């Protein structure tokens, strides 16, 4: 078998079999297939696509390119969730504790932030002492004991995806649905959970710009799950504006703590309750979503959900006093309110722009090796559908140094304010099974 023949074959819309896909993945991981040939193949896939069967076979070949996490020693159904990423997306910090407080077992491996989107690990590391590097043995023990652990991804998990993703990033082949789906699902399948809930986001702050593309991506990943006999479901949610009010690492942890106390933003709470109720049904702990939804509300109101977050922080070496008293989180020296120059209703709020502003303040990274400043970021006062008067605060900036005029202008450009009434947007479009 020759790689050049396979490139020609896909260029002419041929359908690969399992042996051909295995040859490609094995060869690229061991270095016998060079970047330039893999780049040509990825571009051919972008133009010609992959069938559902090809996508599933590609996912499995990638999944088995490295270590597979064995969670069989964890009692009960192991649930996992994955968000396709967005701005202000701190759902794992709320969802993990509420699901575990209802008896769910969530053994989660998370990633870091890159570009305008934040990463769960960066948020957790804003809690002093919190350790994301836990041995597999301790990880399994912790989930058995308290139902929850969130750790960093193993370096030996899905090496094929690491190599292919780095190549896609520099060859204009990122926004290809079969390649996105196989990248996400290979990591989720290798992580060993019994069920997967995907939160597929769309809009200006998300990977997928349109609802139509988000639905296609969700369905592609669900089909992969079915092929691999894994209960996979998806919520399709809007990222037309940031989720919740906080953007930035410790600011988002504080907001997650408030949500676990029942005082969080309505959109964040709604998404976590709906996603959590689907996960509890997947775990066979509840018969239907309504019952599960009530149980999740109950663990928030009786304090068990917050207690579960404290347990996880304590087990992973973090300082629990920060969860008990979020005022302890470091505040940067510059706290600046950005006020409205006009009266009206917020019609649009560019989530991606605000994510980039937070990154420029030091809260995110342009390259994977950069450090992040956990204390900086933004807290929104006004979101889509809110009425605003001249001089009212649109958002508050938390910064290390004087906020530049350029950043202030970028914030103003992120808001569109109109005279006529604006409806608050729908957050969750649908749940796909």
Language-model-detected regions and their locations in the chain:
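Active-site cofactor/substrate anionic-group-binding motifs, chiefly glycine-
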Residues: 49-110, 114
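Alpha-helix C-terminal capping segments
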Residues: 47, 93-107, 187-192, 227-228, ...
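Well-ordered secondary-structure scaffolds
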Residues: 5, 10, 15-18, 28, ...
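Short glycine/serine/threonine-rich phosphate/pyrophosphate-binding segments
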Residues: 87-96, 100-101, 108-109, 115-118, ...
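N-terminal glycine-rich anion-binding loops that anchor highly charged ligand groups
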Residues: 1, 10-73
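A glycine-rich helix N-cap at a beta->alpha junction
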Residues: 123-149, 219-225, 229
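Phosphate/diphosphate-binding glycine-rich loops and adjacent basic-rich segments that engage nucleotide
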Residues: 144-193
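Active-site-proximal beta-alpha loop/turn segments in soluble metabolic enzymes
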Residues: 42-46, 123, 161-170, 199-208, ...
């Amino acid at each position: 078998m020759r790689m050049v023949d396979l490139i020609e074959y896909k260029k002419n819309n041929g359908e690969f079999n399992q042996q051909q896909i295995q040859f490609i993945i094995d060869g690229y991981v061991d270095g016998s297939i060079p970047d330039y040939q893999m780049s040509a193949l990825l571009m051919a896939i972008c133009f010609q696509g992959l069938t559902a069967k090809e996508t599933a076979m590609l996912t499995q070949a990638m999944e088995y390119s490295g270590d597979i996490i064995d969670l069989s020693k964890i009692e009960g159904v192991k649930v996992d969730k994955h968000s396709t990423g967005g701005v202000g997306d701190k759902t794992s910090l709320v969802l993990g504790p509420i699901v575990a407080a209802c008896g769910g077992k969530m053994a989660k491996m998370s990633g870091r932030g890159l570009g305008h989107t934040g990463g769960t690990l960066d948020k957790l590391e804003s809690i002093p002492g919190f350790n994301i590097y836990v041995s597999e043995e301790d990880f399994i023990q912790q989930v058995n004991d308290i139902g929850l652990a969130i750790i960093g991804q193993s370096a030996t998990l899905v090496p094929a995806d690491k190599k292919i993703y780095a190549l896609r990033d520099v060859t204009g082949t990122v926004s290809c649905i079969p390649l996105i789906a196989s990248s996400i699902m290979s990591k989720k399948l290798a992580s060993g959970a019994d069920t997967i809930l995907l939160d597929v986001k769309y809009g200006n702050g998300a990977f997928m710009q349109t609802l139509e593309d988000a639905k296609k991506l969700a369905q592609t990943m669900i089909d992969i799950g079915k092929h691999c006999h894994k209960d996979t479901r998806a919520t399709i949610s809007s990222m037309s504006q940031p989720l919740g009010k906080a953007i930035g690492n410790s600011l988002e942890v504080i907001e997650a703590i408030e949500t676990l106390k029942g005082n969080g933003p309505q959109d964040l709470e709604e998404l976590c309750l709906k996603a959590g109720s689907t996960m509890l049904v997947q775990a066979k702990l509840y018969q239907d979503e309504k019952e599960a939804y009530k149980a999740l509300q109950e663990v928030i109101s009786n304090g068990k959900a917050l207690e579960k977050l404290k347990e996880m922080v304590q087990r992973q070496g973090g300082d629990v006093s920060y969860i008990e008293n979020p005022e302890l989180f470091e505040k940067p020296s510059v706290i600046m309110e950005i006020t409205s120059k006009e009266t009206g209703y917020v019609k649009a709020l560019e989530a991606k722009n605000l994510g980039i502003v937070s990154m420029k303040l030091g809260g995110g990274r342009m390259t994977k090796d950069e450090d992040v400043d956990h204390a900086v970021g933004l807290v929104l006062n006004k979101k889509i559908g809110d009425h605003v008067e001249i001089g009212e605060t649109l958002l508050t900036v938390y910064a290390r140094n004087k906020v530049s005029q350029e950043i202030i202008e970028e914030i103003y450009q992120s808001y569109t304010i109109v005279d006529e009434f604006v409806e608050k947007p729908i957050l969750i479009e649908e749940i796909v099974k």
